[in-house]
Each structure stands twice: as structure tokens, then as C-alpha cells.
UniProtKB/Swiss-Prot annotation:
Catalyzes the isomerization of sedoheptulose 7-phosphate in D-glycero-D-manno-heptose 7-phosphate. PROSITE patterns: SIS. GO terms for cellular component: cytosol. Its EC number is 5.3.1.28. Belongs to the SIS family. GmhA subfamily. Pathway: Carbohydrate biosynthesis; D-glycero-D-manno-heptose 7-phosphate biosynthesis; D-glycero-alpha-D-manno-heptose 7-phosphate and D-glycero-beta-D-manno-heptose 7-phosphate from sedoheptulose 7-phosphate: step 1/1. It catalyses: 2 D-sedoheptulose 7-phosphate = D-glycero-alpha-D-manno-heptose 7-phosphate + D-glycero-beta-D-manno-heptose 7-phosphate. Its cofactor is Zn(2+). Pfam families: SIS_2 (PF13580). Gene3D superfamilies: Glucose-6-phosphate isomerase like protein, domain 1. It comes from Fusobacterium nucleatum subsp. nucleatum (strain ATCC 25586 / DSM 15643 / BCRC 10681 / CIP 101130 / JCM 8532 / KCTC 2640 / LMG 13131 / VPI 4355). The lineage of its organism: Bacteria, Fusobacteriati, Fusobacteriota, Fusobacteriia, Fusobacteriales. The gene is gmhA. This is Phosphoheptose isomerase. Substrate binds at N49, G50, G51, E62, N90, D91, S116, T117, S118, S121, Q168.
Amino acid sequence: MNLISSYKTEFELLRKFIEEEEERKETEKVAQKLANIFTKGKKVLICGNGGSNCDAMHFIEEFTGRFRKERRALPAISISDPSHITCVANDYGFEYIFSKGVEAYGQEGDMFIGISTSGNSPNVIKAVEQAKAQGLVTVGLLGKDGGKLKGMCDYEFIIPGKTSDRVQEIHMMILHIIIEGVERIMFPENYVEE
């Protein structure tokens, strides 16, 4: 067992992401777009399965609560309510649990973020399709080769990790960078001393 080797792989993924100019520009574009969306009184919706669902919930609480410094709460929804998920899964099928949430909460001009470490989650694919049909800006946090979701979103981050845990770790870093970017744009006074 070589745990250090495993973490070296993770750091190599992280290093590649950080050094990739296109990825940095894409992250900045998403942060700017989301700041504009919030400024217009719109919101962000996000979803994922398993650990990615936890990442989605972590992302929204940083907006509805706070990230680093005091500021007003920002409108963010994770499609993760257990009663919604079990109702839709029972009545329509598991592949509709997120798209029905997008249908209910999404409005034209909002942002939707779908997280899938494989890029092949049927329920995330359907949610992206629903978001696009309703005029939401779409962002995909994907893994491996991007799977079926590759090319479906307005903005994409494809992390070519071999295991879901390593992909999720980079996804969470991307989400934190987006949050910080939004705060720096909307609340520059909070970052004056840096």
C-alpha cells in the first residue's frame, strides 16, 4: 500500500488544473457570470449524486451563509431535499429527481451546475437538458473523459482523474474558487486588505 503515491496523483491533477490557462479563464468566466446573475436577482441551482451531492450542498451553504467574511446571503438551491427526491424517484423514476427540481425552481437567466464524476449520470444529464430548455446558464463539473455530458453545458470542467474521490476533491476546489471569485466581484470591500 502506497498512500503517498495516491496523494501524488491527486496533487498532479491539481497542478495540471492550476497551470492550465484555459481552466483558469473558464473558472473566472463562471464566477463573473454567476456574480452577474446574482446582481440581476437570479439564483444558482446545483445537484450531484452521493459525494457530489454533499459538494453541492456545501457550495450553496457558502452562499446562503457566508464564505470568508460577512455579507448578505445570496440565492442558491441544492436539489437535495429527501422528500422531493423520494417522491420523484417513486412517481417518475430516479433519472428525473434533479430535472423536476430544475423545472420547479429554475427560471430563465438562473445558473444550473451539474456535478458528475463520470459525466454519465442519467439524472444529471436530464437536469442539464431541462435547464437548457428553460434558459438557464449551464455548468458541468465532470470527471474522467467528460462522459455523455461532455459538450452539453455552456461551461465545463473535466477532471481526468481515475477515481471519483480524486475528481471530487478537484471539483470542490473549483467550487471554492468560484465562490471566492463571486465575492471578490460583488463584495470587493471584503478583500481590500489582501
